[in-house]
Amino acid sequence: MPRKGPAPKRPLVNDPVYGSQLVTQLVNKVLLQGKKSLAERIVYGALEQARDKTGTDPVITLKRALDNVKPALEVRSRRVGGATYQVPVEVRPDRSTTLALRWLVGYSRQRREKTMIERLANEILDASNGLGASVKRREDTHKMAEANRAFAHYRW
């Protein structure tokens, strides 16, 4: 355990194109091996495709997608007397946003479209419509929490 306490959160700069911190976080999640300009090209291309398909502001579409993917509950392992229980706990708002972005990017990488721009755009559009693998992941997480509701009194 560190004696100094948790490391302070560094402030996120707003995205230069859309002026949104969410887009900055999405770029950082898409980022691989330090290639930030490539990650920005992918995210901006995906948001442009989303704008072309919906005709609305892509940041609003992204926010709607994130609202459909953000988990409210998750299960965490807790060891009690030799047995490990899956204890349902509420998810903090910053963690739920991080999880939602991680799931969006992760499941867009598994899609079958040809380019990453198409995959990310279609996953964002599916999530904003309540479809897609990332929304299913959220529902599965909530089902796990509901199934283990009996262990909620072990919450810490």
UniProtKB/Swiss-Prot annotation:
GO terms for biological process: translation. The keyword Metal-binding does not apply. Gene3D superfamilies: Ribosomal protein S7 domain. GO terms for molecular function: rRNA binding; structural constituent of ribosome; tRNA binding. Keywords: Ribonucleoprotein, Ribosomal protein, RNA-binding, rRNA-binding, tRNA-binding. InterPro entries: Ribosomal_uS7 (IPR000235), Ribosomal_uS7_bac/org-type (IPR005717), Ribosomal_uS7_CS (IPR020606), Ribosomal_uS7_dom (IPR023798), Ribosomal_uS7_dom_sf (IPR036823). HAMAP family: Ribosomal_uS7_B. Belongs to the universal ribosomal protein uS7 family. One of the primary rRNA binding proteins, it binds directly to 16S rRNA where it nucleates assembly of the head domain of the 30S subunit. Is located at the subunit interface close to the decoding center, probably blocks exit of the E-site tRNA. Part of the 30S ribosomal subunit. Contacts proteins S9 and S11. This is Small ribosomal subunit protein uS7. The gene is rpsG.
